[in-house]
Amino acid sequence: MPTFDQALRKAGEFGRFQRRVFLLLCLTGVTFAFLFVGVVFLGSQPDYYWCRGPRATALAERCAWSPEEEWNLTTPELHVPAERRGQGHCHRYLLEDTNTSSELSCDPLAAFPNRSAPLVPCSGDWRYVETHSTIVSQFDLVCGNAWMLDLTQAILNLGFLAGAFTLGYAADRYGRLIVYLISCFGVGITGVVVAFAPNFSVFVIFRFLQGVFGKGAWMTCFVIVTEIVGSKQRRIVGIVIQMFFTLGIIILPGIAYFTPSWQGIQLAISLPSFLFLLYYWVVPESPRWLITRKQGEKALQILRRVAKCNGKHLSSNYSEITVTDEEVSNPSCLDLVRTPQMRKCTLILMFAWFTSAVVYQGLVMRLGLIGGNLYMDFFISGLVELPGALLILLTIERLGRRLPFAASNIVAGVSCLVTAFLPEGIPWLRTTVATLGRLGITMAFEIVYLVNSELYPTTLRNFGVSLCSGLCDFGGIIAPFLLFRLAAIWLELPLIIFGILASVCGGLVMLLPETKGIALPETVEDVEKLGSSQLHQCGRKKKTQVSTSNV
């Protein structure tokens, strides 16, 4: 009985049918990027903020103060460098105790010796000066509530983590396409609710749900794309689909610039997902999944459609097709750590996923804290990511996996450390070094997808990659707290943490086995032999392309 891969070769492994489906599903990567990094614009800090007391409110109305005058006359001098974004006060002058005669004056500080009034903490009635409204001004996420901005991104990543396990399981049980469509619908609906959330609690709850559905849509589209093409094309399509994620990062600042409110940005992030529901009529269910669920006839119908569109013919000999037993096995968590080599690979890969997420998200969100043109800086940082995919394609088949993987992490780590200590008087050098760091961590993020799938045997590949990549979402939960809370102490402190993490990761990945030119391991025993020189010598004669289909 022929296997699915044999039938796919007859129908065409990457013909017109697959290219059309591939292009359509790649657009999901664009919208997922909007969701993944949208907090930079949704939660951008206002230019200035302060709070009003009862007396200041009356004076502002009677004296017709401008916002700048109110800022200067009712709040203490702020000793913050002018180039820092988001200047604000967490205290105000206590003006309520002034005498009656001073109430007639439009200079409330004149009643105090040395024009120095007592200070009290702000308790509400916040005022903002900003060019675009954000969730910070909508929900007063400043001063004592500043940590709640960190929470919004952490909750989104918690949704990603929940979606990876719940919808990942659902996609294996009920089908890739149905879960993809439900996820796209969920992203749209929850996104609209987020845009019109009446309070912060509703905002956070539905942002979590949008994260669940967003991860489900991204994960299942990735799987459908890689399961419908031949094994030789999986490595390339796995990298190219991530380039569409980068395309989303490049497009997002343009949307944010021309959209005056955070609600508009949120709708722009969410509404395109409804268009993906039209894929019901053009994107098929994964035939490979259908076979594992003993629906071979439906899989054959799809393969005949593929063959017809590709200008090929699937002969009557392919009346039944099957998959290998490994593709329907039931793995266990213990299998990932039971043996020495598997244990080493699992722990290092988990750390690599965690580091990639923390450093990547940290560098992206940091753009919202530093000075300069946020929109242009974000756009340029997205452009920087594009060469990363090209460098990966050029190096991994020549230099192997370990060296580019380690080098990209070390470049990212060293760049972060150097940027932290460069003087601000040479911005061009800081920008250049920071750009190298962004390029390095982007490459590391993309390579870990590939290496993870190569190092696990067929019996554990789906489960193992899903479990390890869960550390990516956990890193995303940690990243905003790590960035914003440490930046409040010293703006460059997060860069030092990022630099240490990435540098350590670069050293650890050199301990992984090299898999260039090595056949994909089929069993745990194959993985245990990867470190032996005998297998490496055999591997030079036997080359197999790598599947990244289940990230």
Swiss-Prot record:
Concerning Pfam families, the annotation shows: Sugar_tr
What are the alphabetically sorted keywords of the record? Cell membrane, Glycoprotein, Ion transport, Membrane, Mitochondrion, Nucleus, Transmembrane, Transmembrane helix, Transport
Q: How does activity depend on pH?
A: Optimum pH is 8.5 for MPP(+) uptake. Optimum pH is 8.5 for TEA uptake.
- Catalytic reactions on record: (R)-noradrenaline(out) = (R)-noradrenaline(in); (R)-adrenaline(out) = (R)-adrenaline(in); serotonin(out) = serotonin(in); dopamine(out) = dopamine(in)
Q: For the motif Proline-rich sequence, what are the positions?
A: 284-288
Could you tell me in which tissues this protein is expressed? Highly expressed in placenta. Expressed in intestine, hear, kidney and lung. Widely expressed in brain, particularly in hippocampus, cerebellum, cerebral cortex. In the brain, expressed predominantly in regions located at the brain-cerebrospinal fluid border, with expression extending to regions that belong to monoaminergic pathways such as raphe nuclei, striatum and thalamus. In brain, expressed in neurons and glial cells of amygdala. Expression is low in kidney and lung and undetectable in liver. Expressed in Sertoli cells in testis.
| Cell compartments where the protein resides | Cell membrane; Apical cell membrane; Basolateral cell membrane; Mitochondrion membrane
Q: Where are the annotated glycans?
A: 72, 99, 114, 199, 317
TM region(s), chain numbering: 21-41, 177-197, 236-256, 264-284, 376-396, 463-483, 493-513
Membrane topology, as annotated, equals: Multi-pass membrane protein
GO CC entries:
apical plasma membrane; basolateral plasma membrane; endomembrane system; mitochondrial membrane; neuronal cell body; nuclear outer membrane; plasma membrane; presynapse
Q: What is its main location?
A: membrane
Q: GO molecular-function annotation terms?
A: dopamine:sodium symporter activity; monoamine transmembrane transporter activity; neurotransmitter transmembrane transporter activity; organic anion transmembrane transporter activity; organic cation transmembrane transporter activity; quaternary ammonium group transmembrane transporter activity; spermidine transmembrane transporter activity; toxin transmembrane transporter activity
Protein task: Electrogenic voltage-dependent transporter that mediates the transport of a variety of organic cations such as endogenous bioactive amines, cationic drugs and xenobiotics. Cation cellular uptake or release is driven by the electrochemical potential, i.e. membrane potential and concentration gradient. Functions as a Na(+)- and Cl(-)-independent, bidirectional uniporter.
Q: What is known of its domains?
A: Contains one proline-rich sequence (Pro-Glu-Ser-Pro-Arg) that is required for transport activity.
Protein family per UniProt: Belongs to the major facilitator (TC 2.A.1) superfamily. Organic cation transporter (TC 2.A.1.19) family.
What other remark does the UniProt record contain for this protein?
Mediates the uptake of clinically used drugs including neurotoxin 1-methyl-4-phenylpyridinium (MPP(+)) and platinum-based drug oxaliplatin. Plays a role in the anticancer activity of oxaliplatin and may contribute to antitumor specificity.
Q: What is this protein called?
A: Solute carrier family 22 member 3
Its source organism is Rattus norvegicus (Rat)
Gene it is expressed from: Slc22a3
